[in-house]
Design a protein with these regions (language model features):
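Thiamine diphosphate
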Residues: 1-177
Length: 177
């Protein structure tokens, strides 16, 4: 996470011909949007596809599954109780990209996506295609065990239950070496 956009610049710097794409989430983009400015500065034609689910939703899902709670994974305002459960932030990724000299499209349909990609291929400068996707929809489960430890000491019953499950997973973990 955070590697894709800089890596796409490296591919272009290595002399790649043809199109170079970075397929990233909104969270990854916000980690290093300055790389897009570098692409413009250096004349490196890359196309960045930003899948916008309003946060680090995969991390949120992992936290919910392993520790029973998530914190700060969604790009939201605080609600009246000061929890991060308010409105989702209206981040304009296209304006951000355009402010750095890239060409940008916001697409909502397959037809718009195809058209944006065709137009991006014709461009000589860096491009960004913004696609808003479902916030909490994921593919099929991977059935893998993640070594993410819930707190050992807690008053929260759900976290205690998940800690027991974690310890069972650790007992089954195999080490190679």
């Amino acid at each position: 996470m955070g590697y894709e956009l800089p890596a796409s610049l490296g591919i272009r710097l290595a002399g790649a011909t043809g199109e170079v794409y970075a397929f990233i989430g909104d969270g990854t983009y916000l980690m290093n949007p300055s790389e897009l400015a570098t692409a413009v500065q250096e004349g490196l034609k890359v196309t960045v596809l930003v899948m916008d689910n309003h946060g680090y939703q995969v991390i949120r899902r992992l936290q919910l599954a392993t520790v029973g709670h998530s914190f700060g994974n969604e790009f939201r305002t605080r609600d009246s109780s000061m929890a991060l459960e308010g409105d989702y932030l209206a981040i304009d990724f296209c304006k951000n990209a355009e402010s750095m000299g890239a060409r940008a499209w916001h697409v909502e349909t397959e037809e718009e996506l195809r058209r944006a990609l065709a137009e991006a291929r014709a461009e000589t400068r860096p491009c960004l295609v913004h696609v808003e996707i479902e916030k909490h929809h994921f593919g099929p489960p991977s059935e893998v065990w993640w070594d993410v430890a819930p707190a050992e000491v807690t008053d929260d019953a759900e976290t205690r239950r998940l800690r027991e499950s974690y310890e069972q997973g650790r007992a089954r973990q195999r080490y190679y070496g």
